[in-house]
């Protein structure tokens, strides 16, 4: 630049800094560059997403500075890639939005989406616990940026958040192969940021993330736990650019936005701009459906009772079910089995059970008998439908102990209690479990019954 061009540019920056907030100046103005002023036309290099801001907010500053330095009106041409700047006289840009020219776009680098192609909506098992999350994910995949932006999905580990993130990306890519999509964990985003800072290549990082069509960030809580203020600042700016340009953002977390205590408040606020949905652990029917789907990957026959047994053993997340199938596969392979019985499954998963080996040899009838003796009711009454208070308590305690002390599936336990549904067994189990946390006398009663059964 000539000395006069330097003077013009410095005056313009000083004026903008006086009139704009510090954050606005830092984001929209600080990293722009004056290429040249020729024939009263200033060629200014900036990111394409900032052009509209300059046209709306900087034109008056340019006009004032132009008359002060050049005693003339200075018009503007905005360019987005310095390598494409022409030596010929540029087309003028002004505030007349009815005469917009075609925008130049940066030469974007090749992007690896890092999507896992095996995760799709077709193989995601829906249940009541994830129905809203699936519906919202399908909506943003069908129309990225048009609704629910950002989409924030939270829940415990192993419940399908990563699956949904990838399913969104895979569907968008299927519908639009040219779409720029990036799946990344928050921790890897932090690592990329640190690397680009160390190499002094932040422009590359901005070019990569601020020109996406869909950004999918997994485990965003890591940004609060492990990042510096500078990392959160960069993500804040990236979020703003994408959101302002109606580009889709989807985030997952192990907690809802309000519980991200170490996250900057302005980020938490933005996370809540769109839709927040929760995924909870799958119910029994969903676990059966998940297992039925996943055993298709194995060359073994799983009878229905084995599937129901496994579904009754793990109720916290899908990863436990997947791990159980791997354990069973190992045992079946070593023994060269074709059919996985309940007994084989019980032996294979024994080490995986948190509370150690179950007493698989204890008959449910023995539990019913001891509970009946303690509460002075008959086994026949426990199995029947009579609902007097002492019988109901005895029945629920017996169901609780059958769940705790045996490896029987919920449907099998229900069958032993007069053909009751598995949901009745689960309700009884949860009720007694909750009562034990508050009722010391009940805990003593159940411990006494357990000792007699053993």
Curated annotation (Swiss-Prot):
The transmembrane residues are none
GO biological process: one example: DNA replication initiation
Which portions of the sequence form the region Domain II? 83-113
Does this UniProt record's set of keywords contain Hydrolase? no
Give positions of region: Domain I, interacts with DnaA modulators.
Answer: 1-83
Q: How does it assemble?
A: Oligomerizes as a right-handed, spiral filament on DNA at oriC.
Family classification: Belongs to the DnaA family.
According to UniProt, the name of this protein is Chromosomal replication initiator protein DnaA
Recorded source organism is Streptococcus thermophilus (strain ATCC BAA-250 / LMG 18311)
Q: Which gene encodes it?
A: dnaA
